[in-house]
From Swiss-Prot:
Gene3D superfamilies in alphabetical order: 3.30.1370.30, 3.30.1490.10
Swiss-Prot/TrEMBL keywords: Ribonucleoprotein, Ribosomal protein, RNA-binding, rRNA-binding
InterPro entries reported for this sequence: Ribosomal_uS8 (IPR000630), Ribosomal_uS8_CS (IPR047863), Ribosomal_uS8_sf (IPR035987)
Self-association and partners: Part of the 30S ribosomal subunit. Contacts proteins S5 and S12.
Family: Belongs to the universal ribosomal protein uS8 family.
A biological process term (GO) from this entry: translation
Function field: One of the primary rRNA binding proteins, it binds directly to 16S rRNA central domain where it helps coordinate assembly of the platform of the 30S subunit.
Name of the protein this chain belongs to: Small ribosomal subunit protein uS8
HAMAP family assigned to the protein according to its UniProt record, in alphabetical order: Ribosomal_uS8_B
Length: 131
């Protein structure tokens, strides 16, 4: 039984990028879909599409590579884990990697990128980082 499907999804994206695959499939949850949408908005993934087979949903993710066939994702890492939750206040999530990276934060207003959460003046649980 899988206890952390967000970590599983990040691992699937990381492994697909290392193997230079064009597409990978993730299990669906609203948090994962919001996280993938942030990755697409920030330019780390090309696109995504939710597929439904009966009552089972999956997310098909298209990875993005630069002109040299190198993944645009340098590192993708789970921050808050089931055994150790990490929360940051509105002042702590301002920047990550001097603006070159993105933190995904679960807030009371939904799953947001760190810059959007800072603009709204809210903090929350840091789900993952990507740069």
């Amino acid at each position: 039984m899988m206890t952390d499907i967000i970590a599983d999804s990040l691992t699937r994206i990381r492994n697909a990028a290392q193997r230079r695959l064009d597409v990978t499939t993730l299990l669906h949850s609203n948090t994962i879909e919001a996280t993938v949408a942030i990755f697409v908005d920030k330019g780390y993934l090309e696109s995504y599409k939710v597929k439904e087979d009966g009552n089972k949903k999956t997310i098909k993710v298209v990875l993005k590579y630069d002109d040299n066939e190198k993944s645009v994702i340098n590192e993708i890492k789970k921050i808050s884990k089931p055994g150790r939750r990490v929360h940051q206040g509105k002042d702590e999530i301002r920047t990550f990697k001097n603006g070159y990276g993105t933190l995904v934060v679960s807030t009371s207003q939904g799953v947001l990128a760190n810059d959007e959460a800072y603009k709204r003046g809210i903090g929350g649980e840091v789900i993952c980082s990507i740069w």
